[in-house]
Amino acid sequence: MVFKRLLGSLGVGGPTVDTVLDAAPGSGSAAVPGGALTGRVHLKGGGSDFDISEITLELIARVEAETEEGEQHGTVAFERYVVGGGFRLAAETEQVVPFSVVLPWETPVSELYGQPLGIVLGVRTELAVAGAKDKGDLDPLAVGPLPAQEAILEALGQLGFGFRSADLEYGRIGGTGQQLPFYQEIELSPAPQYAHAVNEIEVTFLAHPGGLEVVLEADKRGGMFTPGHDALTRFTVSHEDVASRDWAAEVDGWVRQLVEHRAAYGTHASYGHHDPYAGGHHGHHDGHHDGHRSGPGMGTA
């Protein structure tokens, strides 16, 4: 995870910058949502002395947006950190600036069990020198799941749901505590026992210090005389006691509620991502978690 770029706005002979991200302990990912992102900014002086006024890290996400012209793609900077500055970098010298910053709780998950989910996250380093600012190339950022996120995705995989895709949607989900200007959707193919009722299920995690909001949306199948429609609901879970819960049973209950209890949703209300969701479910089931790491469509039978 290294990028290097000559700071062109400073002219030939300007300083160069390398930013190296550390892997989180016990994980191949750089960090998890709400966790620390650590690393080092390596600076190498150019042909003359430069006053480094500010070193800034910017978190970037590639998002999709629905517009009148159709689906558009673009990038969003969703967090900035000043990690150094206020010193002179002498010609031809090197300096290392270590940093430790905290990712937003709603930072999307970009990989599961080391496998990329297909979304683009990155860190961009900006150097402010003598009134000029120059941004480096995007350094890929790998973000793994929180324990509760991993447990829920693993349970969905054990139930027979398969991973299809993941993307970042620009906009806000009504009725939630969403903070970022976009949200992640993880699209799953239905488990065999639900294939008659839904075409796919989409999962969105909105993490916060106390736990997760889990938004489930089902693209329901229509019959010969009834159109299909979207059904959705929201659940909340804590970051605590993740290992002691029977996640397969709990998540299966969520899906059953989504498919069965929300079946009439499309007949009396229109759906949009700006409409409030139904009340959350706070169910808790004590049980044994077998620790088998499968995840949706990743190694499941």
Which role fits each region the language model picked out?
Residues M1-D275, H282, G297:
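N-terminal onset of structured domains
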Residues Y277, H281-A301:
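Short, low-complexity, glycine-enriched hydrophobic/amphipathic alpha-helices that associate
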